[in-house]
């Protein structure tokens, strides 16, 4: 997705546009979801700025690209139904990658307190933002 400008000069008065020039309130659920997806993408970017193994880096970049595509679909509403199969396949691929990585480490038996290392803390933050976006989408 290419953005020409980051401002519109239209004076939004609490409104914004979805694709197709549909005007909605800035607290519309489409905008809330896009904000959460954008926040998740930013947290993943912070995580990628850390020392991440190449297999994890590949999965994170793949997730970032999917988040951009999902955000575009959310604001285009009508196209979303047509593209859900694409995201279902991509989700399965990401889950498969996560399963492989999970099998490479010993998993604790209970809940994990956020923290430890900076990448671990960012991973926990990404998880919580992702769960919020998921709740908003459903």
Which functions belong to the PLM regions below?
Residues 1-138:
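Phosphate/pyrophosphate-binding loop motifs in nucleotide- or prenyl diphosphate-using proteins
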